[in-house]
Amino acid sequence: MTIEIQAQQRADQGSSASRRLRRAGVVPGVVYGAGKAAVAISFDHNTLYYALQKEGFHSSILNLVIDGATEQVFVRDVQMHAFKPQVQHIDFQRVDANTVIEAKVPFKFINGEISPAVKMNGKIIGHLLNAAVVRCLPANLPAAIEVDLSTLVAGESVHLSSIKLPEGVEFASLRSGKDLSVARA
């Protein structure tokens, strides 16, 4: 799934300029990384807000079109208003096809209703993590990681080390020796 989003380069920077943009229905942002200079950009608020609602937007490589030039990026940070459905600021990081990146990818839990813990013991499965940071090349970045709960028994946990990942993808926390629990019955 390739998502394309349109942006315009902006000259005005700072909190006053950003406030003026937000009042005009425009979201300030920045794109940086891959050895290039940071570029201040802006987006139409409604277009960006509805793009953020898509499932794979936060964990996919996106095509960012800035005044006609396309760059491959992924979302590094999104700042939302405290109580309004309003995007305050967004950061994108450029990606190089040959450089390993670290990105947060959500879990998709499957087969929980047929696990022995639920069917035989009447347990409720608790999801301890909703996402994890993975290391991979940009081309290998998954939109979501499936966690199969069909073999989960009462009193047991599913750990990061037991989750099957696509080729070329690894959990960043396992590199540092932290085998976190993902779900427990």
From Swiss-Prot:
Record Pfam families: Ribosomal_L25p, Ribosomal_TL5_C
Molecular functions (GO terms): 5S rRNA binding; structural constituent of ribosome
GO CC list: cytosolic large ribosomal subunit
Record GO biological process: translation
Alphabetized UniProt keyword annotations: Ribonucleoprotein, Ribosomal protein, RNA-binding, rRNA-binding
Top-level taxon in the UniProt lineage: Bacteria
Classification via InterPro entries: Rbsml_bL25/Gln-tRNA_synth_N, Ribosomal_bL25/Gln-tRNA_synth, Ribosomal_bL25_b-dom, Ribosomal_bL25_C, Ribosomal_bL25_long, Ribosomal_bL25_short, Ribosomal_L25_dom, Ribosomal_uL5_bac-type
SUPFAM superfamilies: Ribosomal protein L25-like (SSF50715)
Role summary: This is one of the proteins that binds to the 5S RNA in the ribosome where it forms part of the central protuberance.
Subunit structure: Part of the 50S ribosomal subunit; part of the 5S rRNA/L5/L18/L25 subcomplex. Contacts the 5S rRNA. Binds to the 5S rRNA independently of L5 and L18.
Family: Belongs to the bacterial ribosomal protein bL25 family. CTC subfamily.
Protein name per its UniProtKB record: Large ribosomal subunit protein bL25
